[in-house]
Amino acid sequence: MARTASSNSTKPRKSKDNGSTHDGETKVQPELDLEPEPLWKKILLAIPRAFGSGVRAVTGVGEYDPAYRRDGLCFLLLVLAVLFCASEWFRVSGPFGQLLHAIAAGVLGLMSVVLPVLLAAVAFRLMRNSGKGSNNPRVVTGWVLLMWSICSIIDVAIAADHTGFDITILQSAGGLFGFFLGSPLAWGLSNVFAIIIFVVVGLFSLLMITGTHVTDLPEDARKIAAKIQRKPYVPMGQETDGSASQFPNEVRVGDTTLAFADGVPSHDGDDDGSDNDQAGDARPSLFARLFGRKSKTEDDKTLDKYAADDPFDRAASQHGATAETPVVDPMTGEIIGARTIASSSYDGRPHLSSPAPAADADDGDASRTRVITSGQTVAMPGGGAVDDPWAPSAAQAGTVALAGAAGAMGAAGAAGAAAAAAATGAYAGADADGSGVGQGVPNTGGQPNATAGNDTDDDANRPYQLPDLNLLTKGQPHAMRTPANDRVIRALTSTFEQFNVDAKVVGFLRGPSVTQYEVELGPGVKVEKVTNLQRNIAYAVASSDVRILSPIPGKSAIGIEIPNEDREIVHLGDVLRSDKAVGDPNPMLSGIGKDVEGHFVTADLTKMPHLLVAGATGSGKSSFINSMLTSIIMRATPEQVRLIMVDPKRVELSAYAGIPHLLTPIITDPKKAAQALEWVVKEMDARYSDLEFFGFRHVKDFNEAVRAGKVHAPAGSQRKVAPYPYILVVVDEMADLMMVAKNDVESSIQRITQLARAAGVHLVLATQRPSVDVVTGLIKANIPSRLAFATSSATDSRVILDTVGAETLIGQGDALFLPMGSAKPIRVQGSWVSESEIRKAVEFVRTQRKPKYREDIEQMAKEAEKKDSMEPDEEIGDDMDVLLQAAELVVTSQFGSTSMLQRKLRVGFAKAGRLMDLLESRGVVGPSEGSKAREVLVQPQDLPQVLAFIRGETSSLEATAPQQPELGE
């Protein structure tokens, strides 16, 4: 053990640079740390020194070297950090853990959870920055002021209304730190002004911690803006300096000037290239000022080493190790991230975090291999194991090749970049099947295919890659408790006391939009005493949207659901990234949102098996449809799920036009929608015929048997047996379809909902008018799963859910979800996906494949339209011949009289009047003018067009106007 005889002598530490130095370097011997210790260090070292003095008095040994004392202090702080971590984070229930929690919470209150982090940060800083010239006192003082201000703000916000000294309240507020300063200021001034003062103190403490002066804030803001915009940083006052723009890669050190070639980094190592100013003027970053080593003095850095060698040494150190290669978004061309590639084993293939398996030359079913963005590969129908999961497709290799060359240029210079570019170019030129024919870069325009097209051979052989879940926005963390919840609890308790109801609030569950408060009743208290107070409770909490559950399912308590003052947005990306969604590989899984407990809610459309969605305008119905469709796009390939979208509004689902999952272009005509539903019925019957022939009860079992090679076509048949994809039919507005073709639509929906579950066909119906003429009894009886958003009346709520409750929802995604098999609906906050997120996901799948439409659907629509045009109008009935004669008489005579039709056609007055009304509805004559004859609207030369229109041979009456003589002849 290394010790010294007395505390006045110190042992010099070894220099960290034990190897040979570069030519021209000057070694500087470390100076002795004889500076008096600051006060904060004496306080921290008081207990260890007292313990050490006692040990030395007993053993008679000398004092440790100051360097070892400093190391001992650092490890003591780390031990304390571990102990407080056990008590504050993991809630160790032992006596020692309770004592530590009492100390930490009593001093810091709620901020005791950050105490382990602070202790570890102080220990880390003492290890790296100590001794002469250290700025540790300033940093520690700044942290103390920051903690004091935060604790005071918490004390004023939570415990200011409580009088007296109660340690239990202080532990759940700001602790002693906040009480000694927060309570006096709140009592002397007010809560608002006290918080303002503490905010100012907190800002000042941040300046102390970072070592930033107020005059440096504009310069720091310019640096941050330059990094965000990815532009070179130009100091204030040097914007018009011509030398900087003429030599952007020039480095000046003393009297030495060296200009580097383009592509070689000439700054201090930052990848953004924003710190290319002079070395003497550059200020350290925020992280360096907090945790970096102590900077050298001006005398030490002038002769340290030849500064022009730094970029070359850095490039040489990266060669053979790792290099950061940017990954380019194939849709926008922007750099979306960086992946580490080993330079020594670089083979020209970019290593992506979301690998795309290469198509094997000997495997014809490689197009059925599904690539999960997390790196997991799942074999699709007929596909085998992927040999090389890191090999990208030809289009991806062509896109990422430029990124790989750029990363190699920044790491190993121009020569290494040329070699890397040659390697990636050779790989990108190879076809997926090994033919060596370059595929080029796919079209990234994002324009959907306007006409029905088929997949090309390149699309069929190219592996399909699912979009990365990182395309979807991440939301804010869920708040478990806010001051608003405490105010509501006090209001509920006061209401029960005012009406002499023996009930108390025992807990609450905070959701994103509403909070459910659990109320327990005393002995002998009826539930009706609380439910009858609904209006009084709404008055007490200042909210009209109060919903009471009596009781809460599975609990002996009454639930009072009250909207939150500070609502949270549930992002679809958070739902799909949750453990519940990631652990379920079902491609038909859809993200619903969050329940009142803050848990993520998902729905498997194959188990629902059909869904009815209803809600008033602005309630969040369209947002749910977008979330459901985006979930399908993010999780399913076109081989797994095919979509039929019906959008009578023409604009709600237009963003999904051209995606490869579509079976037909988005249908906007209600008549064509009825024909599409009839096609779905025929497809369902065909699937049931296959299931019956091959002996399966569900399409899922049939698909598994096909993938396993257990199902084969009959001998002599030319058919190729392939797995059936799920078919999802989405109708955005049910009311428009029921108005145009109610009988056909209702019968088709009835057959689909009754039989289509085992065939893999599922239906989602949405409407904003949930009346009995739209959601009929036949439709509702076969759709067990319901999702009700805010409705305008309790009657509409009963139509959807068969119970009231939807009329009390607050809108904007607040919904009641009743899945199949559930006794009572679940209140959820629907997930939200923005238009930009939808556009990114849609463009990602568009660039991989073109939609492959079913031609028989369009053919059925054309045949039905032709058949309707050939059939006589039901309004005319058997009077077609008489009507044609009446039209000929009226047009040729230019006299629209009912009495003339009576005489000429020998019909009664009632039938003559009916014929005249039919001619008026078809634009032949004008409206009735009393006893006068009606005006004839067409000319005699237009008689053939009129007769053809009445027969139904043309779609419109095209009357030719008389030609005007040309002037100027």
Swiss-Prot record:
It is found in: Cell membrane. ATP binds at residues 618-623. InterPro entries: AAA+_ATPase, FtsK/SpoIIIE/SftA, FtsK_alpha, FtsK_dom, Ftsk_gamma, P-loop_NTPase, WH-like_DNA-bd_sf, WH_DNA-bd_sf. Pfam families: FtsK_alpha, FtsK_gamma, FtsK_SpoIIIE. Consists of an N-terminal domain, which is sufficient for the localization to the septal ring and is required for cell division, followed by a linker domain, and a C-terminal domain, which forms the translocation motor involved in chromosome segregation. The C-terminal domain can be further subdivided into alpha, beta and gamma subdomains. The alpha and beta subdomains form the DNA pump, and the gamma subdomain is a regulatory subdomain. GO terms for biological process: cell division; chromosome segregation. GO terms for molecular function: ATP binding; ATP hydrolysis activity; DNA binding. Keywords: ATP-binding, Cell cycle, Cell division, Cell membrane, Chromosome partition, DNA-binding, Membrane, Nucleotide-binding, Transmembrane, Transmembrane helix. PANTHER family: DNA TRANSLOCASE FTSK (PTHR22683:SF41), SPORULATION PROTEIN RELATED (PTHR22683). Residues 15-30 have a biased composition (Basic and acidic residues). Residues 213-969 are cytoplasmic. The keyword Nucleotide-binding applies. Essential cell division protein that coordinates cell division and chromosome segregation. The N-terminus is involved in assembly of the cell-division machinery. The C-terminus functions as a DNA motor that moves dsDNA in an ATP-dependent manner towards the dif recombination site, which is located within the replication terminus region. Required for activation of the Xer recombinase, allowing activation of chromosome unlinking by recombination. Residues 598-798 form the FtsK domain. It is a multi-pass membrane protein. The gene is ftsK. This is DNA translocase FtsK. Gene3D superfamilies: 3.30.980.40, P-loop containing nucleotide triphosphate hydrolases, Winged helix-like DNA-binding domain superfamily/Winged helix DNA-binding domain. The keyword Zinc-finger does not apply. SUPFAM superfamilies: P-loop containing nucleoside triphosphate hydrolases, Winged helix' DNA-binding domain. Belongs to the FtsK/SpoIIIE/SftA family. Its main location: membrane. The chain crosses the membrane at residues 72-92, 102-122, 139-159, 169-189, 192-212.
